[in-house]
Amino acid sequence: MSELARVEAIVRPFVLDALKERLTELGVGGMTITEVRGFGRTGGKTETYRGSSYVIDFVPKLRVDTVVPARLVDEVIAAIREVAASGRIGDGKIFVSSIAQVVRIRTDERGEKAL
């Protein structure tokens, strides 16, 4: 069985198209996108609407999940940072974890072949 890794990135929504394009160029075969809301070290943010200030506790983000061969993890991380990093608070986070097994339900392919 080959070594596989899940790369999960929490990013600003407007980077999705560029991120999809960049990861596809690397050979990433698929990804799952989930709309999420959260806050980090700085908490929420304050926005003004029609002269009134509102505290937004949870900021909208996207979670991009993909499973790749472990040998591609550093390239995938670099690609995500290339597209998503602005240098400002709120750029997001990347989490990497090991995947024990992947099975394509339709064909019963396993491991890297299932990606």
Model-derived regions: residue spans:
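Positively charged, small/polar-rich N-terminal and surface patches that mediate targeting and assembly
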Residues: 1-115
